[in-house]
């Protein structure tokens, strides 16, 4: 790996972490509770897991310079991976797969603008 590629990867990591922090603050402002950040399950990573009362929220955070570019980063295969990982997480909940849950997408762009798209894929 070249030094430039390593630097780009590191910058992407920091940008992703910053976007996740912005998303966390947006959810906390709505009264939700953060359960896990960057939870890794058997099918991959979930950016954020939160609770809103009895409901578990799985959030995928996408960031870019504009809202449209952030939205364009959402890929069906990736969302299926998040959905599968969410199922694995729910297995540890008292109600298992019967736990109320939803899958959100959080778009972060510009100077920290944020949009939470609740139940983005209609699962849950």
UniProtKB/Swiss-Prot annotation:
Alphabetized Pfam families for the sequence: UPF0102 (PF02021)
Annotated SUPFAM superfamilies: Restriction endonuclease-like
GO molecular function: nucleic acid binding
InterPro entries documented for this protein: Restrct_endonuc-II-like, tRNA_endonuc-like_dom_sf, UPF0102_YraN-like
Similarity field: Belongs to the UPF0102 family.
Record's protein name: UPF0102 protein TM1040_0449
Organism: Ruegeria sp. (strain TM1040)
């Amino acid at each position: 790996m070249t030094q430039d590629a390593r630097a780009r990867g590191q910058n992407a990591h920091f940008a992703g972490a910053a976007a996740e922090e912005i998303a966390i603050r947006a959810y906390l402002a709505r009264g939700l509770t953060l359960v896990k950040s960057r939870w890794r399950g058997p099918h991959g990573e979930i950016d954020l897991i939160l609770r809103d009362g009895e409901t578990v929220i799985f959030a995928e955070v996408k960031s870019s310079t504009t809202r449209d570019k952030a939205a364009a980063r959402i890929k069906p295969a990736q969302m299926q991976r998040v959905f599968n990982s969410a199922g694995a997480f729910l297995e540890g909940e008292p109600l298992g797969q019967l736990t109320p849950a939803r899958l959100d997408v959080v778009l972060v762009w510009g100077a920290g603008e944020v949009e939470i798209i609740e139940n983005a894929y209609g699962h849950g």
